[in-house]
Amino acid sequence: MTIDTRQLGRVDYLPTYQAMQDFTAARNEATPDALWICEHPAVYTQGLAGKIDHLLNPGEIPVVQTNRGGQVTFHGPGQVVVYPLIDLKRAGYFVKEYVYRIEESVIRTLAHFGVTGHRVAGSPGIYVRMDDPFSHAALSGPVHPSDPFRGLGKIAALGIKVSRHCTYHGVALNVAMDLEPFSRINPCGYAGLKTTDLSTIGVSASWQEAASVLGQKLATYLAP
């Protein structure tokens, strides 16, 4: 069964969040899986593990409490957000592999633009070397005991929810954003974690191009 890919454009977060929940509650064994690709106006979203003290200074940017895993993150213009709505039972893999496949899709998307993405154990999402994001060298050596992200910038965030073996929420890839709002939070609960985007590391890519590539990679890697 093919994945139904939908380009939603720029849409408010709250109605999209509600639509994901409604889709998941209403779907049955015959419902095709879907990828919703969109962009949101500026908003902070809190995951179930989120702590209020990680919201340092949200200012006028709204904060939405959600039921996804993880902690606080920021969505805004210039970021590609993809919500995979996948029946894991039908797909034939479990949550851990699902997360791995999403991360692999981001890594392959970055590779399309010549950038090397990295995983950090225990910290879902994808990171790049800030000193040389195009280096193919693997991360090596022990991580710094007090700063496992030293030298890295987070370029993609991941947060999911699984209900009746069906997924919603998803992944956000930073393309060309105003990164200042990330400085007002501890991204994903980590104080001082640097956040970056493709533009900052020297990649000139349009939102539409990045969205198209990421959508294609997810459709490929999330297939059964």
Swiss-Prot record:
- What name does this protein carry? Octanoyltransferase
Give GO MF terms, alphabetically: lipoyl(octanoyl) transferase activity
Miscellaneous section: In the reaction, the free carboxyl group of octanoic acid is attached via an amide linkage to the epsilon-amino group of a specific lysine residue of lipoyl domains of lipoate-dependent enzymes.
Residues holding substrate? R68, G69, G70, Q71, V72, T73, F74, H75, A157, L158, G159, G170, V171, A172
Q: Which domain of life is it from?
A: Bacteria
Enumerate the HAMAP family for this protein. Answer: LipB
Q: Can you tell me which residues form the catalytic site?
A: C188
- Which stretches make up the BPL/LPL catalytic domain? 29-224
Biological processes annotated in GO:
protein modification process
Q: Does the keyword Hydrolase apply?
A: no
Record keywords, A-Z = Acyltransferase, Cytoplasm, Transferase
Which spans of this chain does the record mark as coiled coil?
none
Report the pathway entry.
Protein modification; protein lipoylation via endogenous pathway; protein N(6)-(lipoyl)lysine from octanoyl-[acyl-carrier-protein]: step 1/2
UniProt enzyme class: transferase
Tell whether Chloroplast is among the UniProt keywords: no
Its Enzyme Commission number? 2.3.1.181
Q: Which organism is it from?
A: Polaromonas naphthalenivorans (strain CJ2)
Any single Gene Ontology cellular-component annotation: cytoplasm
Catalyzed reactions: octanoyl-[ACP] + L-lysyl-[protein] = N(6)-octanoyl-L-lysyl-[protein] + holo-[ACP] + H(+)
Predominant subcellular localization, coarse grouping: cytoplasm
**What role does this protein play?**
Catalyzes the transfer of endogenously produced octanoic acid from octanoyl-acyl-carrier-protein onto the lipoyl domains of lipoate-dependent enzymes. Lipoyl-ACP can also act as a substrate although octanoyl-ACP is likely to be the physiological substrate.
InterPro entries recorded? aa-tRNA-synth_II/BPL/LPL, BPL_LPL_catalytic, Octanoyltransferase, Octanoyltransferase_CS
UniProt-annotated site: Lowers pKa of active site Cys, residues: K154
